[in-house]
C-alpha cells in the first residue's frame, strides 16, 4: 500500500516534476521544418534507441516518469529488438556531460494494444530501466495530469522529439520542439478530419498544415503547461496521416495519458 501511494504521488506530479531548470521559449517553432529546442528545457525527454549493425540508432521518443521508468508508445516496441534509453541529451551524436545511456530490463505493453489496429487505441507502454538514473538539471521526471483530464480546444502544448524535419526528410541531430493547439474531440472525430479513426482516449493537436509531429517523434510527449506553471505530459505521439506529417485537418494524434493513469500506477507498482 505504501509503495502504491508513493507511485501515485509521483505520477500525479507531487515530487517536484515538471519544472525544468531552463525556461521554455514560447514561440511558434515546429518539429516539422523545425526549430531547435533550448538544451535542457525538456529534461524528461528521452531517446529510445535500437541496436542495429552494431550501432545504437534513435527509434522513438519517450518520457521519464520515475527514476527507473519511461513512458512511450506501444507501437515503438518489439520483442525482437535490443533497446537502450538515452537521457539528458540534446544532440544525439554528442550527448555530452550530464547525459546517461541506460539498458532496459523490462518492456510492458498495454494488454489491449493491437498492432494491426492502431485506431483502436491503447498505444501506450512502459519501459523499466536496468538501473535507476540520478536526477539532475539535465534529467528530470515528467509530471502526468490528473486522471480523466480533458484539455479544451486551442490549449497550447508542445510536441518534442528527434523526428523527421519534413515528410520523407532528414532526421535532426538536436532536439526539436513544436507548438501545437489542441483540437477538441468533436472536431477531430468529424468526417472531414480523422473521423472514426480517433477515439475519446486520444488527444488531437495541430492540423493547420504547418506544424506537426513526424516519423521518429513517436512515443514522445505532448507537453502542456498547467495554470500553476507545471509542465505535464498529456499525450504520447501515436500516429499521423499517410498523406504527410503536416497535412491540413489531419492533426497529430496522441494517446491521452490521463485515460491511463490507473494502468500506469498499476504497472509500476507490480514491477
Curated annotation (Swiss-Prot):
Residues 1-16 form the signal peptide. Keywords: Disulfide bond, Hydrolase, Protease, Secreted, Serine protease, Signal, Zymogen. Elastase that enhances insulin signaling and might have a physiologic role in cellular glucose metabolism. Circulates in plasma and reduces platelet hyperactivation, triggers both insulin secretion and degradation, and increases insulin sensitivity. CDD domains: Tryp_SPc. GO terms for molecular function: endopeptidase activity; serine hydrolase activity; serine-type endopeptidase activity. Highly expressed in pancreas (at mRNA and protein levels). Also expressed in adrenal gland and small intestine. Residues 17-30 form a propeptide. The active site is at 75 (charge relay system), 123 (charge relay system), 218 (charge relay system). Belongs to the peptidase S1 family. Elastase subfamily. The keyword Nucleus does not apply. Interacts with CPA1. Interacts with SERPINA1. It comes from Mus musculus. It holds the Pfam family Trypsin. Residues 31-269 form the Peptidase S1 domain. PANTHER family: CHYMOTRYPSIN-LIKE ELASTASE FAMILY MEMBER, CHYMOTRYPSIN-LIKE ELASTASE FAMILY MEMBER 2B. The keyword Disulfide bond applies. Its EC number is 3.4.21.71. This is Chymotrypsin-like elastase family member 2A. Disulfide bonds join 60-76, 157-224, 188-204, 214-245. GO terms for cellular component: collagen-containing extracellular matrix; extracellular region; keratohyalin granule. It is found in: Secreted.
Amino acid at each position: 500500500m505504501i509503495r502504491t501511494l508513493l507511485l501515485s504521488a509521483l505520477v500525479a506530479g507531487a515530487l517536484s516534476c515538471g519544472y525544468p531548470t531552463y525556461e521554455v521559449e514560447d514561440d511558434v517553432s515546429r518539429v516539422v521544418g523545425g526549430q531547435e529546442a533550448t538544451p535542457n528545457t525538456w529534461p524528461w525527454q528521452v531517446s529510445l534507441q535500437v541496436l542495429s549493425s552494431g550501432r545504437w540508432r534513435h527509434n522513438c521518443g519517450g518520457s521519464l516518469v520515475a527514476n527507473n521508468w519511461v513512458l512511450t508508445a506501444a507501437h515503438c516496441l518489439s520483442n525482437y529488438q535490443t533497446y537502450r534509453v538515452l537521457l539528458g541529451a540534446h544532440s544525439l551524436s554528442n550527448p555530452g556531460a550530464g547525459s546517461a545511456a541506460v539498458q532496459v530490463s523490462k518492456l510492458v505493453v498495454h494488454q489491449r494494444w493491437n498492432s494491426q489496429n492502431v485506431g483502436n487505441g491503447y498505444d501506450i507502454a512502459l519501459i523499466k530501466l536496468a538501473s535507476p538514473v540520478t536526477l539532475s538539471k539535465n534529467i528530470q521526471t515528467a509530471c502526468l495530469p490528473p486522471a480523466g483530464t480533458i484539455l479544451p480546444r486551442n490549449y497550447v502544448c508542445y510536441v518534442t522529439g528527434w523526428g523527421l524535419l519534413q515528410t520523407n526528410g532528414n532526421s535532426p541531430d538536436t532536439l526539436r520542439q513544436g507548438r501545437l493547439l489542441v483540437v477538441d474531440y468533436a472536431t477531430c472525430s468529424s468526417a472531414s478530419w480523422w473521423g472514426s479513426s480517433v477515439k475519446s482516449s486520444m488527444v488531437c493537436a495541430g492540423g493547420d498544415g504547418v506544424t506537426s509531429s513526424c516519423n521518429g517523434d513517436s512515443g514522445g510527449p505532448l507537453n502542456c503547461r498547467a495554470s500553476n506553471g507545471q509542465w505535464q505530459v498529456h499525450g504520447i505521439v501515436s500516429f499521423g496521416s499517410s498523406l504527410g506529417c503536416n497535412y491540413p485537418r489531419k492533426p497529430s494524434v496522441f494517446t491521452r495519458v490521463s485515460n491511463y493513469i490507473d494502468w500506469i500506477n498499476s504497472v509500476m507498482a507490480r514491477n
